[in-house]
Structures are given as C-alpha cells and as structure tokens.
Amino acid sequence: MAGRGKVGKGYGKVGAKRHTKKSLKETIMGITKPAIRRLARRGGVKRISSLIYEETRNVLRSFLENVIRDSVTYTEHAKRKTVTALDVVYALKRQGRTLYGFGG
C-alpha cells in the first residue's frame, strides 16, 4: 500500500472531477428566496409578495445577460480572452449605470 496515501487499493486512476454545465433553470434557482429577501430589506422593503421571487430572478437574469454581452464585446474588441473588471465597468457605463471604485 505504499505510495497510495488514503485512497485504498488503487484500481485505476481517478482524474479530477470535471465541471458539468447546469441547466439555466437550475442555475437561476441558485438565487435563493432568502437572498432576494435580503436585497429587498437593504432597499427598505418590509413585506414581500410570493410572486416577487420568480419575477426578480427573471429581471436579474436579463440584466446580467445584457451586462455580460456588452462586457464580452469589449473583451473581443480588445482581442483578449479574459473579461476584466474594466470591461464590466465600461459595459455598465454604457447602460447608464456608472460604477465607481474599479478603475476607469
């Protein structure tokens, strides 16, 4: 058993787990009800209708799609493969939502 650590008998190699792509429905449900509630509390909301949660997820998804699309456009124009913080800042500025504190 030398050289195998705590693995055991060593029947073949086990590689690293690969990331599997979750479906969009699964991913958007990752924005939990308590997380939406915390955001609403920060905005000063006292009571929340049960219909709000799904609508909030849809609005957030469309907002992020727009920001990410613009960020990737800036990245591709600069002939890079990595989206930087400045790409996101410029994408938000383009949509009229200026973000301070990240350069630019």
UniProtKB/Swiss-Prot annotation:
It comes from the Eukaryota. InterPro entries: CENP-T/H4_C, Histone-fold, Histone_H4, Histone_H4_CS. Its main location: nucleus. GO terms for cellular component: nucleosome; nucleus. It is found in: Nucleus; Chromosome. One of its GO terms (molecular function) is protein heterodimerization activity. Keywords: Chromosome, DNA-binding, Nucleosome core, Nucleus. Residues 1-21 are annotated as: Disordered. Pfam families: CENP-T_C (PF15511). SMART domains: H4. Belongs to the histone H4 family. PANTHER family: HISTONE H4. The nucleosome is a histone octamer containing two molecules each of H2A, H2B, H3 and H4 assembled in one H3-H4 heterotetramer and two H2A-H2B heterodimers. The octamer wraps approximately 147 bp of DNA. Core component of nucleosome. Nucleosomes wrap and compact DNA into chromatin, limiting DNA accessibility to the cellular machineries which require DNA as a template. Histones thereby play a central role in transcription regulation, DNA repair, DNA replication and chromosomal stability. DNA accessibility is regulated via a complex set of post-translational modifications of histones, also called histone code, and nucleosome remodeling. This is Histone H4. It comes from Sterkiella nova.
